[in-house]
């Protein structure tokens, strides 16, 4: 199957009351693991690519060609979107789209509201003309992820969310409602009352960033309140690192990179399968 935009898969998730996982990729093995999990689970999947990860892998075009090649060689039949995570500017989003990304996030949340609307509208106009879906953000998600640093959580304002959606025509919205990038200190406290209000005011799929470490019952409640996309990265990083460390501790003389990285790839696949089942997306690509 060819790459698709996120729009239809997220609208279907919203109607079906489940969420599609965005799992960030960092190299070939991460991409293999996530695609293999999606195919095995018959789940739609979103491959998230941060600007930092794209630079690490060689650039937007390299990433797109790698994903397309793997999808062909692995006989992937489920819907796959390749999504720019936290695009920092119109120019970065345009470069990703021109390289073949099927979805982009423009993160202008650190700008004043009117500037956020202006930049987001510019991205939507360019993206939609090319069949590419757009995610935007309001408020501040705490923690740190690659080039994105949010010192503390600032909740999104529901009325601003409604206005942003109406004025820009975005396909999904990531309102900051208590989640953070990276590990949580203590138990997460998501703003479910605000989430429900934003769902009712906007009517579009909502996105939960910082999905690692949020208890299953909170994940399920978020999905019931319109969250249709959940981002996971830290959990895969931890699983990968744990597997590689265990291998090296067991056999410090190993030097074949495939033997070192392989267990990490397997750990990511197992983690992603668990998340797909938790989010309710398993089996949805077969319907």
Curated annotation (Swiss-Prot):
It is an enzyme of class 4 (lyase). GO terms for biological process: fructose 1,6-bisphosphate metabolic process; glycolytic process. It comes from Geobacillus stearothermophilus (Bacillus stearothermophilus). This is Fructose-bisphosphate aldolase. Gene3D superfamilies: Aldolase class I. The modification Phosphothreonine is found at residues 212, 234. D-glyceraldehyde 3-phosphate binds at residue 50. Zn(2+) 2 binds at residues 107, 137. It catalyses: beta-D-fructose 1,6-bisphosphate = D-glyceraldehyde 3-phosphate + dihydroxyacetone phosphate. Keywords: Glycolysis, Lyase, Metal-binding, Phosphoprotein, Zinc. Zn(2+) 1 binds at residues 86, 181, 209. Its cofactor is Zn(2+). Catalyzes the aldol condensation of dihydroxyacetone phosphate (DHAP or glycerone-phosphate) with glyceraldehyde 3-phosphate (G3P) to form fructose 1,6-bisphosphate (FBP) in gluconeogenesis and the reverse reaction in glycolysis. PROSITE patterns: ALDOLASE_CLASS_II_1, ALDOLASE_CLASS_II_2. PANTHER family: D-TAGATOSE-1,6-BISPHOSPHATE ALDOLASE (PTHR30304), D-TAGATOSE-1,6-BISPHOSPHATE ALDOLASE SUBUNIT GATY-RELATED (PTHR30304:SF0). InterPro entries: Aldolase_TIM, Class_II_FBP_aldolase, FBA_II, Fruc_bis_ald_class-2.
């Amino acid at each position: 199957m060819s790459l698709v935009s996120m729009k239809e898969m997220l609208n279907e998730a919203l109607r079906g009351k489940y969420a599609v996982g965005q799992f960030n990729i960092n190299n070939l093995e991460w991409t293999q693991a996530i695609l293999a999990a999606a195919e095995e689970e018959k789940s739609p999947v979103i491959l998230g690519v941060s600007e930092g990860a794209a630079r690490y892998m060689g650039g937007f075009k390299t990433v797109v060609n790698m994903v397309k090649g793997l999808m062909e060689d692995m006989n992937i039949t489920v819907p796959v979107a390749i999504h720019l995570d936290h695009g920092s500017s119109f120019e970065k989003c345009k470069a990703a789209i021109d390289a073949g990304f099927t979805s982009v996030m423009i993160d202008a949340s650190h700008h004043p509201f009117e500037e956020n609307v202006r930049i987001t509208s510019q991205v939507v106009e360019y993206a939609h003309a090319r069949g590419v879906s757009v995610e935007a953000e309001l408020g501040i998600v705490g923690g740190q992820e690659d080039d994105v640093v949010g010192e503390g959580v600032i909740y999104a304002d529901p009325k601003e969310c409604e206005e942003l959606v109406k004025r820009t025509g975005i396909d999904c919205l990531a309102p900051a409602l208590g989640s953070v990038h990276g590990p949580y200190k203590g138990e997460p406290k998501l703003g479910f009352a605000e989430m429900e209000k934003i769902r009712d005011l906007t009517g579009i799929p909502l996105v939960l960033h910082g999905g690692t470490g949020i208890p299953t019952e909170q994940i399920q409640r978020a999905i019931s309140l319109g969250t249709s996309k959940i981002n996971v990265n830290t959990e895969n990083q931890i699983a990968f690192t744990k597997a590689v460390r265990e291998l090296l501790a067991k056999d410090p003389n190993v030097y074949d990179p495939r033997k070192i990285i392989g267990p990490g790839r397997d750990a990511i696949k197992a983690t992603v399968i668990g998340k797909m089942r938790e989010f309710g997306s398993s089996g949805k690509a077969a319907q």
